[in-house]
UniProtKB/Swiss-Prot annotation:
Record-linked Pfam families: Syja_N
Molecular function (Gene Ontology), one example: phosphatidylinositol-3-phosphate phosphatase activity
This protein's name: Phosphatidylinositol-3-phosphatase SAC1
Catalyzed reactions per annotation: a 1,2-diacyl-sn-glycero-3-phospho-(1D-myo-inositol-3-phosphate) + H2O = a 1,2-diacyl-sn-glycero-3-phospho-(1D-myo-inositol) + phosphate; a 1,2-diacyl-sn-glycero-3-phospho-(1D-myo-inositol 4-phosphate) + H2O = a 1,2-diacyl-sn-glycero-3-phospho-(1D-myo-inositol) + phosphate
Cytoplasmic side: 1-519, 569-586
EC number: 3.1.3.64
Class of this enzyme: hydrolase
Segments for region (Essential for phosphatidylinositol-4-phosphate phosphatase activity): 451-586
Organism per entry: Xenopus laevis (African clawed frog)
Source domain of life: Eukaryota
Localization per record: Endoplasmic reticulum membrane; Golgi apparatus membrane
Protein's gene: sacm1l
GO CC term, one of those recorded: Golgi membrane
Lipid bilayer topology: Multi-pass membrane protein
Keywords: Endoplasmic reticulum, Golgi apparatus, Hydrolase, Lipid metabolism, Membrane, Transmembrane, Transmembrane helix
Length: 586
């Protein structure tokens, strides 16, 4: 396998960037012309002694903004652990470096826009969860890697990567077109990775959890739901659990993704906006594309739909059920499980009903296993595709239970667990397992919803607690604020980073400056003034109680009435995306 370079130095001169490969026996230098933007391969002798030098740990890629081209590099990394003897790193800090030496060629308006775009890139890079390896392909599962050709093994990491999970694919377009420079390009995945060295019965093994977020139809909670015309589902995540013991490798894969037809749930200041199923499109085309690709990638599908079967979520459950029936594909099976109803009043033990319901199917699907000689002993023949509304909190709880059941059989088969022993009884490992799955939930939730996950007290401890309920309430409030007042910026940031929106070289019309309606400023001011006057009238009573009551009723009515008008026009007051708004209106 062609590896990427691990040790790099960035040399900066006014005319060029030189990225020097410092691996033993390597003379390659990547040269980027800051004026022509040409990228070429040269030698170490071409690096001027006057260049400013710094260590970097990878090139994330290049992107065009208003000021011109920018180079994005990884400046800090943290080792997560070793996966099958390959070092896995988390990128923890980045630098965005302009090709241009000055900004004198920009107008004030362009400077402002360029600063805004830089802020968007910085925001995406500040979200925790970017991982890479220079010697292991993190974009593929063990099973996919085992079923590849010798030609595939000789490809560079960038060339062979599963493009669904390469978050810097857009930034590396120039590298993709030039095979000779691909060793300088590192595919970066976004999601979560935990690697733990564990011991049960004196037997040491590595336990790994990997969640890969798809960069297709990526975005934030309320602005990206359902699927696009290609069948890509919002918040699609592939989660792989790996065991490495004495040369044996086992893995179990699950997926999650938004309900795969055309629906939306735009923020409108209400705590829980009502989901809307589109009536203007043919749902079956995209629905079929989605499951066709899933069957090709993973085999049989068991859909676990965990949404409520009453209230605003009910139409989505009914539509999903009807769509699967209409699909008529024997490879896709549908199971609805009303998570909140079944587990109401803290009866979380009732999740075992679902686990037992799918137990026979899970045994039939099996798991992937390779022995010490590299021989494939068993394949995973199907997958559980779980979803709730957000594919976060409820989904993660169910996935952790199914993964534990698979792990039980894997460890028994490998001889780590004795006959009759259960994972739940291994206190030290159980703590590692629960915390890793809770951390996985938090990572996926922060990346999609902007806060940590709900219900993680159950994942960490196996039971629901009062403190957990309190923290869920706090996280729900933070989600409400972010979903209504900052998610437009977050969505724009992701669209810019992934290339869904591109800044043209001849940048003229700004998409960022949208004329604000008068009511956007006037109504909140009127409401605040009216509410303040109501409080003042209560605190500073008039000569008679009737006079005080009249003032309080007047200002109170004005405050409530203005608030009602704001709520009625809620969509006008939320922070909406500006860059790719139309495409998000499926």
């Amino acid at each position: 396998m062609a590896l990427a370079y691990e040790n790099l130095k960035l040399h900066i001169t006014p005319e060029k960037f030189y990225v020097e490969a410092c691996d033993p026996g390597v003379e390659d230098v990547l040269t980027i012309d800051r004026v022509s933007t040409e990228v070429t391969l040269s030698g170490k002798k071409d690096i001027p002694p006057s260049a400013i030098t710094r260590a970097i740990y990878g090139i994330l890629g290049t992107i065009r903004l208003v000021a011109g081209m920018y180079l994005i590099v990884i400046t800090r990394r943290k080792k997560v652990g070793d996966l099958l003897n390959h070092s896995i790193w988390k990128a923890t800090d980045f630098d965005i470096i302009s090709y241009k030496k000055t900004m004198l060629h920009l107008t004030d308006s362009q400077l402002q826009d360029n600063k805004a775009f830089l802020g968007m890139l910085s925001h995406v890079l500040s979200v925790d969860g970017f991982y890479f390896s220079v010697s292991y392909d993190l974009t593929h599962t063990l099973q996919r890697l085992a079923n590849t050709s010798p030609e595939f093994q000789e490809m560079s990491l960038l060339e062979r990567a599963d493009q669904r999970f390469v978050w810097n694919g857009n930034l590396l377009r120039e590298f993709s077109a030039q095979p000779e420079i691909q060793k300088f390009a590192i595919p970066v995945v976004h999601g979560f990775i935990a690697i733990h060295s564990c011991s049960i019965n004196g037997k040491y093994f590595d336990w790994i959890l990997i969640s890969r977020r798809s960069c297709f139809r990526a975005g934030v909670r309320y602005y990206v739901r359902g699927i696009d015309s290609e069948g890509h589902a919002a918040n699609f995540v592939e989660t792989e659990q790996i065991v490495h013991y004495n040369g044996n490798k086992a893995s179990f894969v699950q997926t999650r993704g938004s309900i795969p037809f055309y629906w939306s749930q735009r923020p409108n200041l209400k705590y829980k906006p009502k989901p809307q199923i589109s009536k203007a499109v043919n749902h079956m085309d995209g629905f079929q594309r989605h499951f066709d690709s899933q069957v090709i990638s993973y085999g049989k599908q068991v859909v676990l739909n965990l949404v409520n079967q009453k209230g605003s979520e009910k139409p989505l459950e009914q539509e999903f059920s009807q769509m699967v029936s209409g699909l008529g594909n024997g490879m896709v099976r549908y199971i609805a499980f009303d998570f909140h109803k079944e587990c109401s009043r803290m009866r979380w033990d009732r999740l075992q009903i679902l686990v037992e319901q799918v137990a026979e199917t899970q045994d039939e699907f099996g798991y992937f296993l390779v022995d010490t000689e590299g021989k494939v002993v068993s394949q995973q023949d199907g997958i559980f595709r779980s979803n709730c509304m957000d594919c976060l909190d409820r989904t993660n709880v169910v996935q952790s239970l199914l993964a534990r059941r698979s792990l039980q059989y894997q460890l028994q088969r490998l001889g780590v667990l004795h006959v009759g022993q259960r994972i739940e009884e291994q206190i030290q490992f159980e703590k590692i397992y629960k915390n890793a799955w809770a951390d996985n939930a938090n990572a996926c939730a922060k990346q999609y919803a902007g806060t940590g996950a709900l219900k993680t007290d159950f994942t960490r401890t196996g039971k629901r607690t009062q403190w957990g309920l309190l923290m869920d309430g706090w996280n729900s409030l933070i989600r409400y604020y972010k979903n209504n007042f900052s998610d437009g910026f977050r969505q724009d940031s992701i669209d810019l980073f992934l290339g869904n929106y591109s800044v043209e070289e001849a940048y003229s019309t700004s998409p960022l400056h949208i004329q604000t309606d008068w009511k956007f400023l006037a109504l909140p001011i009127i409401m605040v003034v009216a509410f303040s006057m109501c409080i003042i009238c209560l605190l500073m009573a008039g000569d008679t109680w009737t006079e005080t009551l009249a003032y309080v009723l007047f200002w109170g009515t004005a405050s409530i009435g203005t608030g009602a008008i704001i709520m009625y026009n809620g969509k006008d007051f939320v922070d909406a995306p500006k860059l790719v708004q139309k495409e998000k209106m499926d």
